[in-house]
């Protein structure tokens, strides 16, 4: 089934739920590292809000978009609370209350998410910062909140997901342009790269437009995206995960376990942009100023683990946690164990050549006044 519409992607794009060994909750250590690296940017954003007299408000409204069900969103809430307490002590002022909205698509495991909201995260109403948390299911590519209602928006490793597989990936004769691949690769024709960038441009612009209506003037957004350093989207730094998954799928095709047509017609609804592409889209939109934009690299694997099979297995489980729902929708639930077992073996083989580092982008924006 092709992911050709926003509605279809919204139904199947979510992380593995629960708390089992292939759940996102148990396999989010990499995104936890990314979030930790980006935490100073979020701290600075809260500090900036307080420098603009946002501490005089009765409540600070913050949203975490694409929150999933792992522990990372809890760290975000705790950090915002700590910064609010710190700034209000420095300013000798009464601390505003904190309203946090946790957003993700309808298939997200909100039960596991809210089960993890311990008193250590939210605190009690007698603390300096009274914290209230609400779930907001829905697509962040459209409006989610009333006009001028948000002061702070955070999103980590979510905005690079697309509303649909890129348009225009079939020829006039109806043939697949990206045959045998599920994402941009070195063998992809230029039209595939152009289609992916065009879809990201359209979707990120929709995201910015929706937030421009919801965020108050001078409000802040802190966005962390999976991105790339190179200007070429087919470089291995940005496509190696999808490339290895495509190899695993192709092997199951050769064994007769998957129809070849299913592989040829599947294109992942995700795009890892360059810093220049992100900057260009924000400036074209014109609703926000860029306060900070940087890229940084992290090892894709647990490098302190010496056993390559343990490292490969950890990486495969991490990838399975965020890809299985959308992959199984196309190729069938019944072959997922075989597919990811094959993927693990391919990853371990690739360890001999060393996997490339993963690039993340930190983007801090302020809503333009007027």
Swiss-Prot record:
Binds 1 Mg(2+) ion per subunit. S-adenosyl-L-homocysteine binds at residues 24, 67, 72, 104-105, 139-140. Its EC number is 2.1.1.159. GO terms for biological process: alkaloid metabolic process; methylation. Changing residue 270 to C: Slight theacrine synthase activity which mediates the conversion of 1,3,7-trimethyluric acid to theacrine. Moderate theacrine synthase activity. Theobromine binds at residues 31, 157, 160-161, 226, 322. The keyword Metal-binding applies. SUPFAM superfamilies: S-adenosyl-L-methionine-dependent methyltransferases. Pathway: Alkaloid biosynthesis. The keyword rRNA processing does not apply. Mg(2+) binds at residues 178, 264, 266-267. Involved in the biosynthesis of caffeine in cv. Puer. Involved in the biosynthesis of theacrine in cv. Kucha, a caffeine-like xanthine alkaloid with diverse beneficial biological activities including anti-depressive, sedative, and hypnotic activities, improving learning and memory, increasing exercise activity, and preventing nonalcoholic fatty liver disease. Catalyzes the conversion of 7-methylxanthine (7mX) to theobromine but not able to convert paraxanthine to caffeine. Belongs to the methyltransferase superfamily. Type-7 methyltransferase family. PANTHER family: S-ADENOSYL-L-METHIONINE:CARBOXYL METHYLTRANSFERASE FAMILY PROTEIN. This is 3,7-dimethylxanthine N-methyltransferase CkTbS.
């Amino acid at each position: 089934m092709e992911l050709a519409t926003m509605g279809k992607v919204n139904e199947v794009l979510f992380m593995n739920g629960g708390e089992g060994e292939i759940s996102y909750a148990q396999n989010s250590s990499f995104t936890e590292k990314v979030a930790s690296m980006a935490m100073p940017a979020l701290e600075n954003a809260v500090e900036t809000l307080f420098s603009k007299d946002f501490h005089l408000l009765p409540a600070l409204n913050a949203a975490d978009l694409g929150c999933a069900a792992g522990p990372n969103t809890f760290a975000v809430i705790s950090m915002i609370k700590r910064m609010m307490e710190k700034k209000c002590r420095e300013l000798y002022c009464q601390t505003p209350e904190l309203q946090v909205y946790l957003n993700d698509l309808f298939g997200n495991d909100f039960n596991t998410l809210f089960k993890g909201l311990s008193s250590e995260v939210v605190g009690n109403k007698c603390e300096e910062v009274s914290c209230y948390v609400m779930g907001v299911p829905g697509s962040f590519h459209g409006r989610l909140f009333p006009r001028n209602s948000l002061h702070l928006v955070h999103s980590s490793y979510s905005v690079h997901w697309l509303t649909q597989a890129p348009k225009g990936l079939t020829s006039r004769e109806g043939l697949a342009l990206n045959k045998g691949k599920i994402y941009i690769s070195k063998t992809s024709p230029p039209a595939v790269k152009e289609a992916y960038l065009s879809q990201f441009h359209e979707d990120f612009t929709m995201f910015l437009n929706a937030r421009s209506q919801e965020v108050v003037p001078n409000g802040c957004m802190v966005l962390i995206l999976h991105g790339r350093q190179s200007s070429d989207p087919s470089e291995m730094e940005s496509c190696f995960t999808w490339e290895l998954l495509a190899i695993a799928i192709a092997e199951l095709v050769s064994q007769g376990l998957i129809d070849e047509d299913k592989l040829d017609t599947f294109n992942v609804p995700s795009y890892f942009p360059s810093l220049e592409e992100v900057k260009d889209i924000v400036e074209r939109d014109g609703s926000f100023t860029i306060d900070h934009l940087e890229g940084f690299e992290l090892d894709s694997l647990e490098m302190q683990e010496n056993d390559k099979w343990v490292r490969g297995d950890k990486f495969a489980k991490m990838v399975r946690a965020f890809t299985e729902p959308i992959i199984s929708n196309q190729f069938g639930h019944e072959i997922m164990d075989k597919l990811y077992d094959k993927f693990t073996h391919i990853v371990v083989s690739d360890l001999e050549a060393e996997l490339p580092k993963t690039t993340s982008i930190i983007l801090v924006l302020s809503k333009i006044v007027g």
